[in-house]
């Protein structure tokens, strides 16, 4: 579900920024710059990915995504939308990919790791199809604010479901170190 929200953002955020008054070229520039913001998180992932528990990392990312879509839903102005896009759009997506790798690696035997990751990616794609279709319905009927409120609500649901997620913490498993 969280991948569906993130991928829906990839689809609709540039159009939302344009709808909020930003020129198309500037909206594209904002999205391009948000990709560059994620680079330090990739290069320095070894500093935090193996030191923070999987559940904490998951909740941190989900909290940032919830904040992002809440700001979009509340329509606090173009500057706030640009700021949230720059600070969170790609960063949370990349960290969630790393968290997913860490979770799968901790739950599955190494010889089944590729198959398990393929299954995760398949379910992420199916979640994206579901969420994007629902988000499109909300956008058509209630505009960008309604769609973003729906996406924030989906993240709340994911947070509730994550409460029941049992994740082992493997000591000595330095996936990113």
Regions found by a protein language model. Give the residues of each.
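Intracellular juxtamembrane helix-capping segments at the cytosolic ends
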Residues: 95-108
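Helix-loop boundary and gating motifs at the non-cytosolic
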Residues: 2-30, 97
């Amino acid at each position: 579900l969280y991948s569906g929200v993130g991928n829906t953002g990839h689809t609709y955020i540039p159009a939302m920024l344009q709808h909020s008054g930003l020129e198309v070229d500037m909206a594209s520039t904002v999205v391009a710059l948000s990709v560059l913001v994620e680079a330090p998180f990739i290069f320095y992932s070894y500093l935090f990915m193996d030191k923070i528990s999987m559940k904490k990392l998951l909740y941190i990312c989900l909290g940032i995504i919830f904040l992002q879509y809440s700001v979009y839903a509340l329509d606090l102005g173009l500057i706030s939308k640009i700021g949230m896009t720059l600070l969170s759009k790609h960063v949370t997506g990349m960290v969630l990919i790393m968290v997913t790798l860490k979770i799968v690696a901790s739950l599955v035997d190494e010889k089944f790791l590729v198959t398990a990751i393929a299954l995760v990616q398949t379910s992420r794609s199916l979640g994206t199809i579901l969420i994007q279709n629902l988000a499109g319905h909300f956008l058509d009927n209630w505009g960008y604010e309604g769609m973003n409120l729906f996406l924030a609500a989906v993240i709340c649901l994911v947070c509730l479901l994550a409460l029941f997620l049992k994740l082992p913490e493997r000591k000595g498993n330095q996936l990113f170190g």
